[in-house]
Swiss-Prot record:
This is Cryptide Pep-20. Its main location: secreted. GO terms for cellular component: extracellular region. It comes from Tityus obscurus (Amazonian scorpion). It is found in: Secreted. The keyword Secreted applies.
Length: 7
């Protein structure tokens, strides 16, 4: 997965 939590 990638950037599931945002910045």
């Amino acid at each position: 997965h990638e950037r599931l939590l945002g910045p």
